[in-house]
Structure formats: structure tokens, C-alpha cells
Amino acid sequence: STGGGGAAGGPATGGAPAGAGGADAPGGAGTAGTGQGAQAGDAPGGQGGGFVPEPFPEIDPEPPPLCANPEPPDYFQFLDDTCGDKRFPTYEDRDFTCPSVDASPMITRADGSVVLYEPAGAPVVVHEELTDLVPAGMFVTVILIRRVGGVPHYRYLSNGTHDTAYQPWSTTKVLAAANAASRLRIASDYSVGLTASAGGYRLGDLVTSICNYDYDPFSSNGLGRYFHDVGGRARANDLIHDLWLGRPASETFGGNYGAAAPSIGYSFVEDDGATVTISPDTTSGPANNLSSFTAAEAIKRLVLHREEATQRLPGIQWSDIETLLYGAADSTKYGPWGGMTRDTAIYHQVGHDPDYIEARSKGQWRTFSKLGLGTSGQFLDVGYSCWPVLDDEEQPVAGYGREFVIAANLPTGGASWAERDRLLARAYRAIITRIVDGRL
């Protein structure tokens, strides 16, 4: 299951504020019952009344050991879930909105420091607070999200590498599919999108196959190229720049993934009979060369399409994004959990205790992600998680929910690729544990 081939002008960079939680701050990994990171001046409970969640479980800084019989044995424990540990939420709803609430953009962290979250449109400042948490040579951007009065507010973190571009490998295949959806919508006067079928195949099932690498019946790499043929490579590159993300010219997107496109065809039909036929783009596009900031920002904007109207990918509809996130609706092949929920990588999940996350959210959590693996052992992942806290009446408890995006690339480190996979999982655990307990 290996992978194949912000704001306009780029973010400013800020140092860690006084009192920022470091490796030895109170409530570290392995410490239970520490502060939650509530809003300044708010009592715990908020919208959920006086409800206070259970204390945090002790989280070992080391991810789980390798199981006795990994399958396939020559793949990777966390990138490929060779121990079969992947979990899905018990609450099914394709129209899910993260039930996380905060009363103020001023957030008090576990160490008592107060940090400000900003709404979309505010100048982006990236705080370099991750340097001591991640391996040397790792590229990483984290976007923390707080919903204040239903409006998302953001705080960006990195280790100073957020603007450094690299080959993002297979993490970009979902962006190729998103671009394809956009082109189909515009070409069909918005009547055809990723909800359609081509050549007898539901596009949503093909998106799932991109993410879970089941080769049934096409390869993930070939499907990545197919979606570039549909969306167009020049347009894919434009999305990185003036058309959508406003990133620098040094970042480019439009390269293929090392396999030929399958013979699916380019005539698309919706269940209601709407059709469109397009001419495929078979040109060679610019190489894929993106930063972790760009990868994280793109996924953030896709997931928050409904909330952030000014940051929407042009042309795409929410039903297309539902297809990216969950796969085809009512899929007889994959069931309710397709699309990016089927990514084989479990870096977000091993970042904390999945039983605790399931219980405190009453099953109403989500993780959408996409892995990448380079030919020289570059381990990558980009993903979004919503981990709310609900009270006994399933109402959100203000100040306790967590919502975040992480884009990471670990190109070096460890004596083997398997050890590098573990190093990346350990870095995710260090970051996510601190997100959950309120130190970040």
C-alpha cells in the first residue's frame, strides 16, 4: 500500500509565547488528570451544563508494540495498519458537523498560558512550538481549530519547516479527486460531480480505493492519474496559487503517480440521469512539490467547506466533499466508511487512546486522512480529526472538544523503514496527546 509519485503570500512566523507547554510541562504524556485547556474565564461544562469529563488516561509516549502476526508481514504497522487496529466511529452520519464548541477565542492552556485563535481572513501566524516534540528532519504543520459561536477559529503550529516544499507523494491524490469534482461540476452546470459513475464504476468507490489500496479493480496510483486526467493538471496547479490557496510559485501540483490511468472512460452519469462527457487532459503536468502548510490548509478548507464560504474550492459541492471523506453514498462495496475514513494509516488513532476518544464523544468523532510513502522511505500523512466531548445528554461540553489537522513528512531517521514508521507514530503521539490534554 505504498504511495506513488493559506493564506495568500504565505504565513508569518511567530515564536512560542511565554509559558508555552514544552516537553516537561505539566500534564505530559503518561500523566493523567491534567488541565483541559478551557476558554479563559469559563467554567468547565459550558453548553453541556456542569458536566466534567473523566480524567485523561495515562498515555505511554511509545506507540503500541508490533503484533505477533502482522499482515502483510513486509508492510508497516502504522502506515498500513498491519495489526488490524483501525477503528471507525459508532455514530454514522455523512452530514456530520464537528460538535465542538468554545465560548471564547482566548484559550487557557494546561500550564495557565492564554493563546488567541483567529478566524479565517486574519493574518496567519505560525507558532514554532513543535521543534522539541518531533524528530530532526521532520516537516510538519498543525492547525488547531476552535468553534466560537459556531465560527471556526484557528491556531497554526510547526517546527519552522511549514513553508519548505517537498515531494508529497500519494497524500495529494485526494486533491486530484477534488479538482476532478470541480471540473465536472463546472462542465455540467453543476449537475454532475464525484457522486456520478463512469464506465460502470461509482467515482466514490474509486476514491475509497485510492485511500485503502485494495487494487479492486484498479491501483491507487493509476486512479490518482485518472483523476488528474479528469480535473486537468494546469488547473490542479492553479488551485495551489491564485485560484484557491494563494501559495508561492515555488510550490507546484499536477504530477502523476507512477502508473497508467485505468480505462474507465470520461463520460459521467448521475443517478438522476444527468450526464457530462469531457476530454481528458493527458499532458504531463508540473511536478508535485508542496509544503506541509499547503497540505494542511487544503484539507482544512475541504473539510470546513460548509463553514468557510470564502475559502471553498471553486466549483466543488458539499456532496462531492462528502464523497471524498466517506466514499460513495450507500456503497454496497464499502458500506458507510469509505473515502478518507478508509486510509490505512492510523497515525491519528495511535496519537491517543481510541477507547477514551470513542467514549467521551459518544461515538461522534471523525478522522479523515491520506498517507504517502516515497521511494526512498519518506513517510507522510495529512489528516483531520474531530474529537469532541459530549455530556450524558449528548450535548457538546464547551472547552473540551478537540479539532485539528496535521500534515507531516518524515524522510529520514531510524535504522529501517519500519523504525521510521514508528518514529512518525511517536511524533504524532507526542503532538496529539498535548492537543488533547490542553498543552498545545
Language-model-derived ranges and their functions:
Residues 182-208:
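Short, well-structured active-site flanking segments
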Residues 96-129, 137, 198-312, 316:
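Active-site-adjacent helix/loop patches that line small-molecule binding or acyl-intermediate pockets
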Residues 52-124, 287, 300-440:
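Structured C-terminal helix/loop/strand segments within mature extracytoplasmic catalytic/sensor domains
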Residues 165-191, 406:
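Active-site SXXK
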Residues 178-186, 225, 297-304, 433:
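Short glycine/serine- and small hydrophobic-enriched flexible loop segments
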Residues 134-165, 181:
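Short, conserved catalytic-motif segment at the N-terminal edge
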Residues 1-54:
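Ser/Thr-rich, Pro/Gly/Ala-heavy low-complexity intrinsically disordered linkers and tails
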Residues 135-139, 161-163, 167-172, 290, ...:
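Extracytoplasmic
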